[in-house]
Amino acid sequence: MTDDKKKILIDYNAHTINAMRNVVKEVLKSIQNNTLPENHHFYITFDTNFKNVDIPSSLKNKHPEEMTIVIENSFWDLIIKDSFFSITLSFSNIKSKLIIPYNSLLVFSDPYANFHLKFPKLEYNKEIITRIDKNKENIINIKDFKKDK
């Protein structure tokens, strides 16, 4: 007898997505000295509304939902951390620092290598707000229990 409704206890999808994000992190580490291998260049699309994304307001106004950056010849101060990377790029001849969490990534592409990764758009911000709103119903103010003295 086979059970058609198996309970899968290992979230392979989440592990795969984490591995894909780790590929991006390792690739960026490999160019941290501001040197890309010949002909390689990266397109990175990210969710500009994602928690801890930090970009100048002028860029946020131009890209209210998503933004694609190109890492090619001119980039500075690439710093790789466990949960994000930061990079300085030039936009209209103005250098701007961007902080991009790996969880905000939507696309990573190296057209020269014909390598492309597409990530699901995470809805953490909406989930947290919904959870907080639901929990507000269960919050009791301590002032309601204090006796006046």
PLM ranges: what are they?
Residues 13-99:
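N-terminal recruitment modules of adaptor/scaffold proteins
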Residues 1-7, 18:
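N-terminal, Lys/Arg- and Ser/Thr-rich interaction peptides
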Residues 8, 119, 125-146:
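Short hydrophobic short-linear motifs embedded
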Residues 111-123:
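Short acidic, Gly/Pro-enriched loop/turn segments at secondary-structure junctions
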Residues 99-109:
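Phosphoinositide-dependent membrane-docking surfaces
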